[in-house]
Every structure is written in C-alpha cells, then in structure tokens.
Amino acid sequence: MPKMKLVVVGNGMAGARAVEEVLARGGADQFDIAMFGDEPYGNYNRIMLSNILSGAQDASEIFINPLSWYGENGIKLHAGARVTEIDRAARVVISENGTREDYDKLLIATGSRSFIPHMAGLNTAEGKIKPGIFGFRTIDDCNGIIAMAKRSQRAAVIGGGLLGLEAARGLINHDCEVHVVHLAGHLMEMQLDGTGGAILKSSMETMGIHVHLRKLTVGILGDDNVTGLTFKDGSTLDCDMVVVAAGIKPNAEIGLRCGLTVERAIVVDNHMRSVDDRNVYAVGECAQHRGRVYGLVAPLWEQAKVFAEHITSRNPDAAYHGSKLATKLKVMGVELASMGITEPAEDRDEIIQFTEPKKGTYKKLIVRDGRLVGGILMGDISKAAYLMQCFDRDAPLPDERLSLMFDIGTPSQKITIDEMPAGMQVCNCNGVTKSAIAACVSSGKRSTKAVMDATRAGKGCGSCKTLVGELVEWLCGGEVEEDPSVHYYVPTIPLRKPDLAKAIREQNLKSVSAVFKALAGGVEDAPSKPALASLLITLWHKD
C-alpha cells in the first residue's frame, strides 16, 4: 500500500512534537513527511529563550530537534521557507521561495508571534519598526536584544506577564538598568492574584528590576532611535531600548487565506481537525478549540497526541476535550505553581490562604463544593503535585483544609509515586511524563542521569530534578545504578546543592562562568547552566 503524504506547516514546538508523536505510533510506515519552518533552524525550546538572553546558555543548547534529526527520521525539512499559500482544492502547499509540496493530510502548526500594539512613534518614516524595539519570541529576537543591550543604558520591557518577566530576567545579566511597565494592577495577573503579584514584585525589586504598574504605553519617543516611552497618564520613562512582551497573536492568516474558519485562531474540532476540511488539522497556538486558544506547553502536548492518534488511526476516536490550566514553573528564581481561577467566582467558594512575604512564600486555594477550582503556590510548592492532581481529576478534598498546605499531624496530603497517573507531566519545560520516564527505564536506563539525558527531564529550569530521581528509583525497585554525579547540583562540580551554595557564597562567585572556573577547573556543563543561573539569582538577589 503506497504511503500518504503528510505536510506540516510550522517547525516549532507544536509541529515538531506532533511529528514525534506520529513517528512514535509507526507513522513513518504510513506517511512521507515534509515540514516547512519560517526559521532556518531545527525545533528549539522557546521556554528557554531567557537563558539565551541572560547568557546562561548558547542558542545551540536549547535545540530539541537539531537539523540532523529530520534526515535521520526520513523527514524532508524546508527550513527558512515561509508558507504563503495553501491550495486546498489542489492539495498543495507553496512557500515564498516557490517550494511546493503536495499533501494528502495537512497539519498547520504556525504558532504565534509577539503582539506589538499600535503606539505613536513605533515605526520609522519608511514604515519599519524603529531600531531598538524588539519582540521576544525567537532566537533571532534574542540575538538582536543581546547586541543592543551591549550599548544600552536603560531597557524597558512592556508587559509584566510571564513572557515579560522572562525577558527582564535575561536582561539583568547585561550592564543596563531594567524597567518593567505593566498595564494591570499586579504582575502575572493570569496566574497570580494581587497578593501574589505584590510578593513577586518585591522579589523583582530586590534583584534590581524597577516595576511600574497601571501604565498604558501609548507612544515611543525619539526620531531615529528610541529615547523613551510615554504613558496614557502623561508620564514618561527614559530608555534607549524596548522589549515588547505584551502578549501573543496567533499566526492564523494562512488559514484565513485558504478559506478555513478563523476566529481568534483556526477553528478545530475534537480531533484537532479543521471544521471545514477533513484533510486539514491544526495544533498549538494557531488552533482554537471550543472558543479557546492555549498558550501553555501542556495543552500543546495533549493536542499533539490526539492529532497523532487520529491521523495514524491508532485511535480514530481520540478526542481533545480542552485543558484545565495548571502549570509549575520558576519565575525570577521563584518557584511557582498555579492552577484554575485566582479569585473566588461564586458566593459558595471557600478560600484558604497563607502569606509570609519576607520569605517570599504565598499559598492560596479556592475550594468549591469540596473540590479544588483554583490555587497559587509561591516559594514553597512541596504540595504542588498532589494539588495539581486533585485539580485535574476534580477529586474530593480532605475536610482538614490546612493539610492541603502543611503537614500538621494528619496524614500527609502529598501524592505518592505510585499514585501518579501515567500521563502526569513530570517536567513541564520539556513535556516529559511519568510514562515516558517509565519507558526509558524499561529500555535499560537505570540511573537518574541516564534517564535525564535520554528524556530531557530536568534539563530546563531544574525544579523537577528531585522528583525525577525519586521516580527513577521507584521504577528501578530501589536498585538504581549509582552515579555519584546525580547527587551533584552540577555534574562537573562534586557538591550537593547546599554545599555548592555555601561554596558560591564563600568565594563570592556571581556568574555561571565564575562558578565553573573556580569549582570545576573551567570545565562547563552546558545543560546545567539554566539551573545554576537560577541558583545564583536566588543567592545574590539582595545584592
């Protein structure tokens, strides 16, 4: 039986993950696969762009699928070829450089781009964006920001959401003053309430970042180059560089041009298939499902799996029913878990709250009819796995509500390893589930380091390393192959985290390169740089 032709428009995290899922289900025997990507690179982890900006990682270190991966898996990649036309009648995709690919099945995974709102002075007389103004979405964006930061005195980041704070985190490692201006009354209003936002603001200010709230940017000052911002309230802020992180806009225009239904994004059904064409699918930030467009990684992974199950006929009934939004991440060196709503929405909603601002600790849970409908954990996220499972499964909660936050003598409300569902995400940065780690151990990897190297779990912000180690030990029945370096915070430095922190303080080491030079004989471990950079921010944020 001849193979069908699958063409994927988009080589970002959504498109490449969807292809990985297809291959994992034997899709190489069913399809010849061709991919188009706007950028001249393989697929990389956009979550780690702030590490590129800060200098903690080189761009080459964040690639999930390097260019060699495509050929090795029989995939024809058209890198740096933006698709400008889809002819659904002829079933052909055409790029701006004239490359054509016929298809039997088409996946659109064009993602999103930085939303740059209209502001006076944004463009030059020629209609181009003024020099010194950047989005924060791609490797090329990072390279431009880094080059500008070398000669910048004061940088302004427009947007105090997750993306804006990641940009600010990256900029503080350069010798320029960093200001964050935000329209809302507190930072990260999609994940935090006012109290949590205030604690985060305080943490940022101790790191030397200036935060300006309730500021609507209406103009950019300067004729040929940026000299400042002007706000709706009449105030101004001097700066010579602007990073716009005010949200994202789905890249759905290609769907509109080929006649697909597009609202905020390309409208899809429960199979991630266009509502207009049974041969066209869409996943990721360019897809709209039941009125929602998802910007977090976990929904993207779920959509990719449903697409792969359906298109390979592994499970023709596979369906995506939407995602309950829950995330665990590290922002400005502060560990954070957020799920569901941040404020009570009904009179019967019950709030359990604990605040310890000096330690940067904040916990808030919203319970409705004995079920968790929202939660914020900041600083101490030891209960996050249990609470996120309760939230995801809509499980009944114990009557002793304080046990949800603290160990108070009642049975500990923490999820055990064996209670973790197979599909539970262990590493949010790289989308690694419990089942993926179990499969890795079954394949013969018997040490935590080997599993981390093979699956990329724990290779992002580093906050899941302990859980990964516990899971590997459980899967190995306690017979883990001992690798001394697994206990080291950095493999090339033979010190556990507390001892490493002590050595850093005693030797006054304030950069990643200084730590490697002093404690590892100059031998650098690239995958450990993000976690080490985060540790340095935590240790020195008051200096």
Model-derived regions: residue spans:
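FAD-site-proximal beta/loop scaffold in flavoenzymes
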Residues: G127-S152, I220-T230, S235-E309, P396-P411
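Beta1-alpha1 glycine-rich phosphate/pyrophosphate-binding loop at the start
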Residues: P2-K76, G170-Q191
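Short hydrophobic core segments
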Residues: E101-S112, I158, V178, L237-G247, ...
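FAD-binding core/adjacent interface of flavoenzyme oxidoreductases
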Residues: M1-V7, F63-A156, T230-K232, V243-A245, ...
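Rossmann-like NAD(P)H-binding beta-loop-alpha module
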Residues: D140, G144-L192, V226
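Mid-to-C-terminal Rossmann-like scaffold of FAD/NAD(P)H-dependent oxidoreductases
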Residues: M1-K5, N11, C286-A385, I408-S435, ...
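A Rossmann-like FAD-binding core segment of flavoenzymes
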Residues: A28-D32, K76-I94, E101, I172-N270
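Glycine-rich Rossmann-fold phosphate-binding loop(s) that bind the pyrophosphate
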Residues: G10-M13, R137-T138, G159-G161
